[in-house]
């Protein structure tokens, strides 16, 4: 099974690309946001974790994502500690997902994970796909989610610069056009792998950037 990881800034279109892989190649998609949101709704371990760090975010036994988001944007020491634990839980879920999909004979799996590179989730991938759009479209999409200018700037500041993400990736998809164009890019990626190209590009590139990413992750955890 080939495992693709999607890197890209918030609002770049990673979920769209993941859906294209699922529709065109029957790829299994690991959607970290959906998994975390589901755990917020009823997972006892996650609810207990939130209650420990942010008791004001528990309403009738359920995590209030709206209240929790305020702690995220404050990005204090408590949030960083909480986030580190949450990432470790999601990483275990991701590894379990990959093993399960491999056992049933799936050909492709796609990891749609925020901070794929920054938090180290890319290590489970065979190939990284950089998904991007023009900055103006990205900001438009984020505004439509109800984020303020300040919140958008903060959110994007946590992510690697565009150039670094693209340099690290094995493939690139522009998600600013029509869906047909995005689908074409997805099929080209799969076709190039089936033709035997790109198979030996990933190791050298990942090794070259591993130390830089580890330093960034360490800085985020200790800030």
Curated annotation (Swiss-Prot):
GO molecular function: ATP binding; dephospho-CoA kinase activity
Enzyme Commission (EC) number: 2.7.1.24
Record's GO cellular component terms: cytoplasm
Key word Signal present: no
Catalytic activity from the UniProt record: 3'-dephospho-CoA + ATP = ADP + CoA + H(+)
CDD domains on file: DPCK
Keywords, comma-separated and alphabetical: ATP-binding, Coenzyme A biosynthesis, Cytoplasm, Kinase, Nucleotide-binding, Transferase
Major localisation: cytoplasm
DPCK domain location: 3-204
Pathway participation: Cofactor biosynthesis; coenzyme A biosynthesis; CoA from (R)-pantothenate: step 5/5
Function: Catalyzes the phosphorylation of the 3'-hydroxyl group of dephosphocoenzyme A to form coenzyme A.
Name of the protein in question: Dephospho-CoA kinase
């Amino acid at each position: 099974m080939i495992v693709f990881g999607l890197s890209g800034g918030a609002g770049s279109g990673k979920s769209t690309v993941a859906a294209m892989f699922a529709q065109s190649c029957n790829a299994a998609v690991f959607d970290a946001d959906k998994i975390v949101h589901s755990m917020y709704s009823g997972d006892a371990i996650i609810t207990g974790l939130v209650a420990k760090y942010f008791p004001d975010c528990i309403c009738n036994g359920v995590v209030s994502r709206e209240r929790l988001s305020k702690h995220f944007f404050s990005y204090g020491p408590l949030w960083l500690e909480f986030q580190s634990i949450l990432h470790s839980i999601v990483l275990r879920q991701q590894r379990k997902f990959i093993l399960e999909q491999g056992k049933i004979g799936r050909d492709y799996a796609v990891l749609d994970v925020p901070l794929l590179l920054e938090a180290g989730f890319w290590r489970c991938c065979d190939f990284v796909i950089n998904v991007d759009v023009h900055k103006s479209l990205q900001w438009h999409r984020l505004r439509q989610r109800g984020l303020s200018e300040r919140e958008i700037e903060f959110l994007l500041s946590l992510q690697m610069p565009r150039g670094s993400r693209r340099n690290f990736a094995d493939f690139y998809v522009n998600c600013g056009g029509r869906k047909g164009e995005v689908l074409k890019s997805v099929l080209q990626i799969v076709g190039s792998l089936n033709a035997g190209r790109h198979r030996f590009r990933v190791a050298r590139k990942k090794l070259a950037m591993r130390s830089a990413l580890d330093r960034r992750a360490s800085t985020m955890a200790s800030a």
